[in-house]
Amino acid sequence: MANILILGAGSIGTAFSFPCSDKNNSVTIIGTHLENNFIDQINSKRIHPVLKCNVPKNVQFLKFNKLSETINKKADLIVVAVSSKGIEWASTELSKVLKINTPIIILTKGLAIHNNNYEVLAHKMERLFNKNGIKQTNISAVGGPCLAKGLANRVHTSVVFANSDIKIVNQIAQLVSTDYYHVFTSDDVVGVETCAAIKNIFSMALGASEGLCNSNVTKEIREKNYLNTAAALLQQSIIEMGTFTEKLRGK
């Protein structure tokens, strides 16, 4: 059993607490400085206002002012579940209280820009920690797809945990893998984060495959025969994700 601290009480942070809790870990969710009222709502009814489901009974929800105290009680794993815009804030706040080499895993998806180049969020957080005087960091990333409501309802979900030291993500995977939350591991942080960030662009194209298949045929034909186009778009999506990953020096 591990002590897992999740920073961010939103949909994905709370959903991630389900497999963590089901694996008999001690789980604490700390809301951000903007989520104090949100934490009160959850604690009053034990229902997440966005996910619309009961939260696990053994998951503790605390306000942001408890962050330092909770980490000092020994957090074995810190999970960052804030928005991509909140990564800088989270890095700053964690820098104030972080113990050396405490494992961190980021649920947040996205790419940042630094010095006119793309930067994956794990590398951004490492850079910000270094800037704030934390020289030794241990940051992993998560690639999906993983919709929060699906995970909170314990449907089969497959994800990838990535760290340049694969032993670290193998250990984290053992902590949270369940019979419905299936974790693969990779040492390609750039590749996993890049594909996780851009996959939704391609998923929109796949979702539009019926309309894109051929504008010169009837709607009935499109409805029955769009799968060729969907398959072609899927193939092109994989090619382009590979090209983008290579450009960012992933594997």
Please provide the spans of the model-predicted regions:
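NAD(P)+-binding Rossmann beta1-loop-alpha1 motif at the extreme N-terminus of oxidoreductases
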Residues: 1-54, 59-63, 114
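Nucleotide donor/acceptor-binding cores
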Residues: 2-3, 102, 157
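Short beta-strand/turn micro-motifs composed of small residues
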Residues: 8, 30-31, 82, 108, ...
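Short, charged helix-to-loop "capping" segments that act as catalytic/coupling loops
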Residues: 31-39, 65-74, 110-118, 210-219, ...
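Conserved hydrophobic residues forming the short capping helix/wall of the S-adenosyl-L-methionine
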Residues: 46, 125-129, 245
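Rossmann-like NAD(P)(H) cofactor-binding subdomain of soluble oxidoreductases
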Residues: 57, 61-68, 72-154, 172
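Internal alpha-helical scaffold of NAD(P)-dependent oxidoreductase catalytic cores
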Residues: 97, 131-138, 156-251
